[in-house]
Amino acid sequence: MERACEKQDSVCNLVAVFENNRTPGEAPGSHSLEDQPHSPEHQLSLSPEPWEAPPVKEALKSEFRPVSRTYLSSLKNKLSSGAWRRSCQPGVSPGPETQEPEEKRVVRELLETEQAYVARLHLLDQVFFQELLREAGRSKAFPEDVVKLIFSNISSIYRFHAQFFLPELQRRVDDWAATPRIGDVIQKLAPFLKMYSEYVKNFERAAELLATWMDKSQPFQEVVTRIQCSEASSSLTLQHHMLEPVQRIPRYELLLKEYVQKLPAQAPDLEDAQRALDMIFSAAQHSNAAIAEMERLQGLWDVYQRLGLEDDIVDPSNTLLREGPVLKISFRRSDPMERYLVLFNNMLLYCVPRVLQVGAQFQVRTRIDVAGMKVRELTDAEFPHSFLVSGKQRTLELQARSRDEMVSWMQACQAAIDQVEKRSETFKAAVQGPQGDTQEPKPQVEELGLRAPQWVRDKMVTMCMRCQEPFNALTRRRHHCRACGYVVCAKCSDYRAELKYDSNRPNRVCLTCYTFLTGNVLPQGKEDKRRGILEKEASAAPEQSLVCSFLQLIGDKCSRSLPRSWCVIPRDDPLVLYVYAAPQDTKAHTSIPLLGYQVISGPQGDPRVFQLQQSGQQYTFKAESVELQGRWVTAIKRAASGRTPEGPDEEDVSD
């Protein structure tokens, strides 16, 4: 019967906590612990008004540093550290060895730390909070709303612990001989610990406001400093006291975990204590989630500020996945340019640094939607660690500073792509239902005009990729087809077609893409002419060649070295060596039938040099490495003897 009465009193106390919330105009001391009806053991020995002492000049000069978000997030990693728990309890020291059970010693430690914690809450709510509110109303030197933002919902937390949990815990310890259990008490506490999430989320903002107004308002600083110098504050700063509620839930979890470990296997409180531990763990996770959400929003805000707070990118629901500098490979310039990428869960922002670092740090040049984006590694000897990002809006060739950085960027992009595709598939399955179409969609073979192409770099070609006429700076300049990315001359790109990836705006396209996109018949006189013997595309050679690479042709007179050329032995014409001015040229400037040639390796004492000789004709080539020279010599010897790689005993020398 007595136990039932105790439970009824506990519920009444709990209801009173939330029915008697203080209003802004309420008297400052109307809910102090001294007014509560619990036993003398619960009374807190606080000096009545120590903060009324005259201001201390030295204390006014002290600096207050805001608690960083990094330090706040580190609290999540300390849940299992017993040493951390003990270091946070300077006023609690283990007493002499007694004969009481170990689980009771843990409960007594929980009670002692709870008493000290409620004293800190009383100091925060009834002293700091009320004194600052009174000063704000009297002097109008700082807004009352600022004070309320700094202390958040500390009043609810204080009343809950002072009027409900501490009295319940005290009664249970006093009656331990008759009721050796606390699991049921903790279970009553656990659901209300979620109120800490609001306090934790507001903590960093509160610390910033406190630091700001300590510098900005002299009356604000004087009130805080007077209280900090008092005996009740133990010479600790307000920020130190404000951190206690953030640390309290991890301490509950540590103490309760130790209590469960000390309980005997047949203890009547074991089941309730384990259930209470699970509930405390859930509350700790809830608090950690609040910290993570606060960090996410703060990180988003920092990025948005550096990008100039543009309306079309600012969205609090976004998730920042990765950001950092990269090098942009230009299709016109030989040296890559410094750029900055910001990857969100739904878009990739391609940014350029601003010349004047006033306000925004970067300017968003292109936004690429993750939906439909593709990423792959590029095999480019001139630009190592390079990768391609192809989106509907634009295709970018990028270079990282190391292979690890390149892999990290590619993995981050691919993870974002996979997540978007997974959500899309889930949505389609929900719309179609179990009776929906189960056939796998056929991949779209032709994406011409639907997504931005990869542009061929200017220096990779020396002639128009459509008409094979050589470029020059005056009469035949380079242009890019916006549909296929080929480098073409003005005559071959004098057409306009609407491209879907560019919001159906007319763009310069080549004749071939114009015909495909519009369906119009080729204009008279524009039909493709018959291919000549040298018109074998070099762009297809790396995938369809026995061997291909840059070779330097050494002249006969005075060993004069000519510019290096792109040389290919095609699979479909394995007895001929084609020499191109650039890798993407559609027409070779020289072809050498290899049948009957004699191959001499290293004629000039250089292991990278080899020579072709036949009937007074002589060609001397220099490879970029000894290994590459060996591959060329093997392939040419095979071709010179009339053998082709289709035989079963022949070896393919291509990579």
Curated annotation (Swiss-Prot):
Outcome of substituting residue 454 to K: Loss of early endosome localization
GO terms for cellular component: cytoplasm; cytoskeleton; early endosome; early endosome membrane; nucleus; ruffle; ruffle membrane
Superkingdom: Eukaryota
Consequence when changing residue 287 to A: No effect on early endosome localization and reduced JNK1 activation
InterPro entries attached to this UniProt entry: DBL_dom_sf, DH_dom, FGD1-4_PH2, FGD2_PH1, FYVE_RhoGEF_PH, PH-like_dom_sf, PH_domain, SOS1_NGEF_PH
Tissue specificity as recorded in UniProt: Lymph node, spleen, B-lymphocytes and macrophages (at protein level). Expressed at high levels in lymph node, spleen, B-lymphocytes and bone marrow macrophages. Expressed at lower levels in mature bone marrow dendritic cells. In both immature and mature B-cells, expression is down-regulated by prior B-cell receptor signaling. Expression remains high in resting B and memory cells but declines upon differentiation into plasma cells.
Residue positions where Phosphothreonine is found in the record: 644
Positions annotated to bind Zn(2+) 2: 481, 484, 510, 513
Residues in PH domain copies: 319-418, 544-641
Any GO molecular function: guanyl-nucleotide exchange factor activity
Domain DH: 102-290
Comp. bias regions, Basic and acidic residues: 32-41
Alphabetized UniProt keyword annotations: Cell membrane, Cell projection, Cytoplasm, Cytoskeleton, Endosome, Guanine-nucleotide releasing factor, Membrane, Metal-binding, Nucleus, Phosphoprotein, Repeat, Zinc, Zinc-finger
Function in brief: Activates CDC42, a member of the Ras-like family of Rho- and Rac proteins, by exchanging bound GDP for free GTP. Activates JNK1 via CDC42 but not RAC1. Binds to phosphatidylinositol 4,5-bisphosphate, phosphatidylinositol 3,4,5-trisphosphate, phosphatidylinositol 5-monophosphate, phosphatidylinositol 4-monophosphate and phosphatidylinositol 3-monophosphate.
Protein name: FYVE, RhoGEF and PH domain-containing protein 2
Organism: Mus musculus (Mouse)
